């Protein structure tokens, strides 16, 4: 019920002031983390909201960008590394929804880009290319299935469920959602 209320409030806010869903999601994400903090901390957080390079979107302490150019997973990850980034790792439902919105804002829909998950070393032992803990999963029903023993990489927004699918890394999909850490500069309240 709370998520429905929040969704309705976000939709109403978009309609009333023309804010993008990404901006509202960033505000919502910050509000969750601020909780009972004082007014001074809220002002500092608001000042620190947009610390990503142009074309990147901030969620927490990371910046995300969508690249539509189709590549295999290894070439997509190599492209990310050349930009000082990695294919995205996903650590919560809220973060996954944010990534879906980043993709939708660039494509007008739900394309199926790569993210940084892979199990090429051992089947069903998943890792993120950025080395972070694989602590969240959002698989489509029946996945991961490692069809044909050759599906060690992950795409998002798969078919009608818009969840994850394990797939052959050599397939060509949009290069993916890229991420990089951002160093949050905290301004001391005066």
UniProtKB/Swiss-Prot annotation:
UniProt domain C-type lectin: residue ranges: 60-179
Keyword set includes Cytoplasm: no
Domain of life from the UniProt record: Eukaryota
Keywords for this protein: Calcium, Disulfide bond, Lectin, Signal
Pfam families, A to Z: Lectin_C
Keyword Iron-sulfur: no
SMART domains: CLECT
GO cellular component terms, A-Z: brush border; cytolytic granule; cytoplasm; cytosol; extracellular space; plasma membrane
Subunit comment: Multimeric.
Protein name (Swiss-Prot/TrEMBL): Ladderlectin
Source organism (scientific name): Oncorhynchus mykiss
């Amino acid at each position: 019920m709370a998520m429905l209320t929040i969704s309705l409030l976000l939709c109403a806010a978009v309609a009333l002031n023309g804010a993008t869903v990404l901006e509202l999601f960033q505000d919502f994400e910050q509000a969750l983390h601020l909780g009972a903090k004082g007014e001074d901390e809220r002002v500092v957080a608001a000042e620190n909201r947009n610390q990503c390079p142009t074309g990147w979107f901030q969620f927490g302490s990371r910046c995300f960008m969508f690249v539509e150019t189709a590549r295999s997973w290894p070439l997509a990850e190599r492209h990310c590394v050349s930009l000082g980034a990695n294919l995205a790792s996903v650590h919560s439902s809220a973060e996954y929804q944010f990534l879906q919105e980043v993709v939708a804002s660039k494509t007008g829909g739900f394309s199926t880009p790569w993210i940084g998950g892979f199990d090429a070393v051992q089947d069903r032992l998943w890792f993120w290319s950025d080395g972070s803990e694989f602590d969240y999963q959002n698989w489509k029903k029946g996945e991961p299935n490692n069809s044909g023993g050759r599906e060690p990489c992950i795409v998002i927004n798969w078919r009608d469920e818009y969840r994850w699918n394990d797939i052959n890394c050599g397939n060509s999909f949009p290069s993916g959602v890229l991420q990089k850490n951002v160093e949050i500069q905290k301004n001391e309240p005066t």
